[in-house]
Amino acid sequence: RPPRSTLFPYTTLFRSLAFENNIPLVAVSHIEGHIAANYLTYPQLVPPYMCLLTSGGHTAILKVEDYNQRTLIGSTIDDAVGECFDKVARVLGLGYPGGPKIDKLAKEGKSEITFCKTPLVGTYNFSFSGVKTAVINYVHNKEQKGEGINKADVAASFQEEVCGELVKKSTRAAREYGMDKLVVAGGVSANSRLKEMLKGECEKQNISLFMPELGLCTDNAAMIGSAAYFMMKKGEGLSDTNLTASSVVKI
């Protein structure tokens, strides 16, 4: 997430614009923005629904009861999924951002390497530090032995395991909470394998799947505007000119 200091200039700018033009100033959570991106792609989408949040800083399953009203069902206890993609991409020498690079490389490989299985069963929480560490150790061990690795196979195997966990828990949550709609939000929703796996599983379970168009998956101003629109309709989020920025977002 960005340092708090980087947000201050923009907060000051928007406070000034709102004051000078006598227009509302709405405080929008980054998470609310990612969720609200789906309302731009699917105008017909209305709560309630189950939401899978997948971003660089957050991974969670949320029950969305109403616009800007949600209940946390489960979340990561260590690394966020986007962060995990970035760290694995780094050890493979792919650079940043890791998500798109692993997604592209994985198409050339086979998901035949077993790294580790998540230890969290019987819960909606996630843990990605185990598979991340397993991949890093695998690569380092091969390098120490002077053995080559097939980076495409590593990328495909890692991606398959992580996406499988996201799909399994989010669809199970939707089913067990009686939700027939699953909404996906955050930058990792752009992952092609995640889309493919979610589509297949949701079709099997008769769950309607909603994923934002590619241009709205990562951080963008439109998603913030969408969230602000629904907040203003309910008279929520209106702030005065003393609004301050925060780099820590509570799910």
Regions found by a protein language model. Name each.
Residues 46, 53-54, 61-150, 199-200, ...:
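A short helix-loop
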Residues 179-198:
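Glycine-rich phosphate-binding loops at beta-strand->alpha-helix junctions
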Residues 121-129, 136-183:
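Adenine-nucleotide phosphate-binding core of ATP-dependent small-molecule kinases
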Residues 15-24, 43, 176, 226-231:
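Alpha-helix C-terminal capping segments
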Residues 27-28, 182, 199-224:
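Conserved phosphate-binding/catalytic loops in two-lobed NTP-binding clefts
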Residues 1-13:
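Short, small-residue-biased leader/transition segments that mark boundaries at the very start
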Residues 23, 28-50, 227:
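Conserved phosphate-binding catalytic cores of ATP/NTP-utilizing and phosphoryl-transfer enzymes
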Residues 14-34, 76-78, 208-211:
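Short, acidic/small-residue loops that bind anionic groups at enzyme active sites
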